Amino acid sequence: MLPFPPGAILRDVLNVFFVALVLVRFVIDRKKTYFPLVFTIFSWSAVILWVIALTIFSPDKIQAIMGGRSYILFPAVFIALVILKVSYPQSLNIEKIVCYIIFLMFMVATISIIDVLMNGEFIKLLGYDEHYAGEQLNLINSYDGMVRATGGFSDALNFGYMLTLGVLLCMECFSQGYKRLLMLIISFVLFIAICMSLTRGAILVAALIYALYIISNRKMLFCGITLFVIIIPVLAISTNIFDNYTEILIGRFTDSSQASRGSTQGRIDMAINSLNFLSEHPSGIGLGTQGSGNMLSVKDNRLNTDNYFFWIALETGIIGLIINIIYLASQFYSSTLLNRIYGSHCSNMHYRLYFLFGSIYFISAALSSAPSSSTFSIYYWTVLALIPFLKLTNRRCTR
């Protein structure tokens, strides 16, 4: 069985058709657009050419193709969505799409919480198979004997970082005056699921999101404290599992447990090993060697990193890392430019939003390989593409 299930194949095929159709229509109609977006498209083209070159010279073509798709396909949804909204304004209903994303994350977060309370049996009752991609695929779904929230997304790390995007969307909707109580309740559910994923970076980012929005909104502070006082005691009384999670979370952030100390030291050792390897082999190991594509290889070439920047360098070399960083940074800059043109923010409020976007990506990339997964990457670039056009009130200022 290939470590590439039918659902993933269908997702990638649909992704290719979506991006290709948008670009073809854009070229045929000869639509004009902003220079940063044009630069982004050229940067993306450079990534494609580099991946093609690496694939041609790779001894394992299938492995290289599996590795290359995360660089070409997942972030490209940003380009397609921005082109649609800028060149064909009526083609997308941003409010409905954002509400759908929030609702979807609320549903999977609820499922993940119930699953944790049922000790990992709930998603199995829903038909989830943790070996959907073969026995060789090792999933991160437990820690120190405790089930980690995954929501059926296979990996607790990717799941936790994905939900931080939901928290950010909820807080942005709240700041724009859109269904404030509902958004706050949903964000709390998402935060509980993030905590149950036991993903330190995601918990840190979610706390940072709340802190920055609360600082600029007293209503949010009052509502948040009220909900916290009501919800947390009810959950704590209903089950003692929260006591175990609280103890583990404290251990995760203080390194007071043996497992946590091993995790922290392991990351340091992996970073040193990656730097040593790249200093001797700046061209890296090869495309597809760090992800699931490595399972197709006779020889295990993976060098564990838990860092997406090292991941890119090990797969595409130092040059590939530079090209990818330029491409990803160009998309981020394009979003900030579009926010200044189309956004609902005034003053310096958009800096808060993009600081949080940058924090989500940097922390997830520095502490994991989450940006290489479709679970996190597609949602991240989708939200980054849509957020400049999100106007939920007639006010031009975020308060």
UniProtKB/Swiss-Prot annotation:
One of its GO terms (cellular component) is plasma membrane. InterPro entries: O-antigen_ligase-rel_domated, WaaL-like. Keywords: Cell inner membrane, Cell membrane, Lipopolysaccharide biosynthesis, Membrane, Transferase, Transmembrane, Transmembrane helix. Pathway: Bacterial outer membrane biogenesis; LPS O-antigen biosynthesis. GO terms for molecular function: transferase activity. The chain crosses the membrane at residues 4-24, 37-57, 64-84, 97-117, 151-171, 185-205, 222-242, 309-329, 353-373, 374-394. The keyword Cell membrane applies. It comes from the Bacteria. Pfam families: Wzy_C. It is a multi-pass membrane protein. GO terms for biological process: lipopolysaccharide biosynthetic process. Polymerase involved in the biosynthesis of the lipopolysaccharide (LPS). Catalyzes the polymerization of the O-antigen repeat units on the periplasmic face of the inner membrane, leading to the formation of the lipid-linked O-antigen molecule. This is O-antigen polymerase.
